[in-house]
């Protein structure tokens, strides 16, 4: 039975990875986050939730102790300082982003290597400036903001570390600052702007969590060790490209929200951070999944699993 440690289990990504893994037979799951009391789940399976703060653990001693207690075979790193919390003019936010996004992945990789563990690390489309679109694994990183630069620096090249690049949307248990939660929080009868000049081909947190499950179990013929040796980062692009206007319209349709999405094309420059793929091993069928279908699967899982606890 593989033992898996999910770091950052109360964030948008970590919460979904935890919920999916706790329902997977044959996995021994340990969770970790800054405030374990915030973890809640409708899953009847008992789980250990450890306390861990990547920002405060500058010397790595807390991480070493956590791995010694948990003895994981795989670590899914869902810890990160996201864009809203590391604005360029925010000195404290910049410092946190450097510690957590850029430096922590190296401490994690080294600590995991000492114990024979493998690490799955999410990489972001925000390492690109969004001018050209269709960015492949070989496209140079050219973002100039704190988030993009720190996430770029945190992509670790090592045999026990697999960087998976994608952009994610999903529900949140706590902070509710994501695009989906923001939209769902709009009152019926309201109007929101939908940017038709912003293009995106990300994934749901459920899709990413299930990919992680395949990487741990070797599902769909995915061999972690072989994949980690294929390059610094692999792009995961199973879904079609949509505009943010179309995406918000799908939110309304799938979640039954009576919210009007106003089409906007003239506010700010066009943004296209869509990803291209040179090595389609993670999604060999290419971008064949309709975004509506991916969102319906996400909504169904959220309801059936009792995601919000």
Label the model's feature ranges.
Residues 209-272, 305-309:
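Mid/C-terminal beta-alpha module of Rossmann-like enzyme folds, strongest
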Residues 48-102:
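NAD(P)H-binding glycine-rich loop region in Rossmannoid oxidoreductase-like domains
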Residues 7, 32, 78-79, 119-125, ...:
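SDR active-site strand-loop-helix element
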Residues 91-99, 103-106, 126-164, 168-174:
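Catalytic helix-loop patch of NAD(P)-dependent Rossmann-fold dehydrogenases
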Residues 144, 156-207, 213-214:
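NAD(P)-dependent short-chain dehydrogenase/reductase
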Residues 31-40, 53-54:
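N-terminal Rossmann-fold cofactor-binding loop
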Residues 2-25:
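N-terminal Rossmann NAD(P)H-binding glycine-rich loop of SDR-like oxidoreductase domains
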Residues 285-309:
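Amphipathic terminal alpha-helices
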